[in-house]
Amino acid sequence: WIMGHMVNAIYQIDEFVNLGANSIETDVSFDDSANPEYTYHGVPCDCRRWCKKWEYFNNFLKALRKATTPGDSKYHEKLVLVVFDLKTNSLYDHQAYDAGKKLAKNLLQHYWNNGNNGGRAYIVLSIPNLSHYKLITGFKETPKNEGHPELKEKVGFDFSGNDNIDQVAKAYKKAGVTGHVWQSDGITNCIASFIRGLDRAKEAVANRDSSNGFINKVYYWTVDKRATTREALDAEVDGIMTNDPDVIADVLNESAYKAKFRIATYDDNPWETFKK
């Protein structure tokens, strides 16, 4: 999965997919009542990027629905996965459940079209704080309560705080999650990737590939350089988040990687661990 980073303005959906992304990451900020409000990152953000692009969340969802609904004039067949980077650090821990519920209601109405030929992309909810695990509970209960239990098949989870992998496992246990797990690892592109290294990403990959691991997919962020792309591919991650999708696409075309990796399509289940 080539994951376009910080796609917060509607026009950027086309821009990133046209550069080679089959997945996008979108920031979601919340108001004081735990309602998702804007697709907005704010300052600071990655180097060489404008941090302040935004839309109202529901307007973005409607545009995203069009981009992922077959037959729509804005449809992109290859856009198959969307990561919502949930900026929940502005919320109190006790608001996490409500935030999940309200997020699900917004998606149900504006993205899934109340279960009537809505957008088809798989969704990853990326949560920065392990203590906000109840967001998952609130989110999962909502489609079920609204008569659309099938939509839970479209949703997976990620804790994005670079926490200890064992602690992440405990948070999922509390949330009752037993699958659909993506694990992110990384650092802003402003800091050279060699300073962080890939040790934790490799630890996540080892968990993914072990018989008793809880992780299904691993992605590394934010990668804009060819050398770092190669290192991440050598570590056998499933996804790379980038500001420059064309760079990742170029490296995937190199002879060393062409035979081993391919771009994921809608038929590739993002919740299944890839078996070599």
UniProtKB/Swiss-Prot annotation:
Gene Ontology biological-process entries: killing of cells of another organism; lipid catabolic process
Domain of life where this protein originates: Eukaryota
Glycosylated sites: 129, 253
Cofactor(s), names only, from the UniProt record: Mg(2+)
Gene3D superfamilies on file: Phosphatidylinositol (PI) phosphodiesterase
GO terms under cellular component: extracellular region
Keywords: Cytolysis, Dermonecrotic toxin, Disulfide bond, Glycoprotein, Hemolysis, Lipid degradation, Lipid metabolism, Lyase, Magnesium, Metal-binding, Secreted, Toxin
Recorded GO MF terms: lyase activity; metal ion binding; phosphoric diester hydrolase activity; toxin activity
Tissue and organ distribution: Expressed by the venom gland.
Catalytic-site annotation from UniProt: 5, 41
Compartment(s): Secreted
UniProt keyword annotation of Transferase present: no
Binding site for Mg(2+): 25, 27, 85
Disulfide bond sites: 45-51, 47-190
Reactions catalysed, as given in the entry: an N-(acyl)-sphingosylphosphocholine = an N-(acyl)-sphingosyl-1,3-cyclic phosphate + choline; an N-(acyl)-sphingosylphosphoethanolamine = an N-(acyl)-sphingosyl-1,3-cyclic phosphate + ethanolamine; a 1-acyl-sn-glycero-3-phosphocholine = a 1-acyl-sn-glycero-2,3-cyclic phosphate + choline; a 1-acyl-sn-glycero-3-phosphoethanolamine = a 1-acyl-sn-glycero-2,3-cyclic phosphate + ethanolamine
Alphabetical list of InterPro entries matching this protein: PLC-like_Pdiesterase_TIM-brl (IPR017946)
Catalytic activity, EC: 4.6.1.-
Pfam family, one: GDPD_2
Functional summary from the UniProt entry: Dermonecrotic toxins cleave the phosphodiester linkage between the phosphate and headgroup of certain phospholipids (sphingolipid and lysolipid substrates), forming an alcohol (often choline) and a cyclic phosphate. This toxin acts on sphingomyelin (SM). It may also act on ceramide phosphoethanolamine (CPE), lysophosphatidylcholine (LPC) and lysophosphatidylethanolamine (LPE), but not on lysophosphatidylserine (LPS), and lysophosphatidylglycerol (LPG). It acts by transphosphatidylation, releasing exclusively cyclic phosphate products as second products.
Protein name: Dermonecrotic toxin LsaSicTox-alphaIB2ii
Taxonomic lineage: Eukaryota, Metazoa, Ecdysozoa, Arthropoda, Chelicerata
